[in-house]
């Protein structure tokens, strides 16, 4: 765990490193995962995600890294120690909430999945923390309502759908998503996850 954390801390982490971390968190022994949590791995991932999001305009590498960090979070939160640690770090939930308005639809879907899980993990604390994250999203985007920035991104995705469900007239974002090798990241699943959230 320390090797990954060092890569994030000295800002030498690559997209491949983050992919590798997500796979390791998904397949490792629970002891390794607990060591990652105890070494402040959740905090380090949160800080890195927020740093990516606040750089200004994100390039393709930044967008890929944002998505991979969310995959790492998802793997981490699939364990009791990881999910419990997430609720101890509101900054983590803030970063994930900011991903609800990412430029990439697949990233927004991943963020909605994670936040939906956290809402139900430790009631009512998880739900309250997700609402706080949405409040911080409102402040970051200078909106009046808690859900305005999130709903604007959701509405743009729905409006970008092609004619009769095809790619004809679809937005570049929806076109990219449907052409990707991730059938689970389709527009209908994204919309349903947002409805549940």
Describe the function of each predicted region.
Residues 172-174:
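Low-complexity, polar-biased intrinsically disordered regions enriched in Pro/Ser/Thr/Gly
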């Amino acid at each position: 765990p320390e090797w990954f954390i060092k890569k994030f801390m000295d800002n030498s982490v690559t997209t491949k490193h983050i992919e590798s971390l997500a796979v390791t968190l998904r397949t490792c022994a629970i002891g390794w995962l607990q060591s990652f949590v105890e070494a402040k791995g959740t905090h380090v991932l949160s800080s890195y995600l927020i740093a990516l999001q606040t750089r200004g305009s994100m390039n393709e590498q930044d967008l890929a890294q944002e998505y991979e960090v969310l995959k790492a979070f998802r793997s981490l939160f699939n364990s009791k120690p990881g999910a419990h640690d997430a609720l101890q770090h509101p900054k983590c939930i803030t970063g994930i909430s900011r991903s609800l308005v990412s430029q990439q639809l697949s990233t927004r879907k991943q963020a909605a999945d994670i936040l939906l899980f956290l809402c139900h993990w430790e009631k009512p604390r998880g739900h309250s923390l997700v609402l706080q994250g949405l409040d911080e999203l409102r402040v970051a985007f200078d909106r009046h309502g808690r859900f305005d920035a999130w709903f604007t991104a959701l509405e743009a995705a729905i409006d970008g759908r092609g004619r009769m469900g095809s790619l004809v007239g679809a937005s570049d974002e929806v076109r990219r998503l449907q052409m990707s090798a991730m059938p689970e990241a389709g527009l209908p699943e994204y919309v349903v996850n947002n409805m549940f959230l």
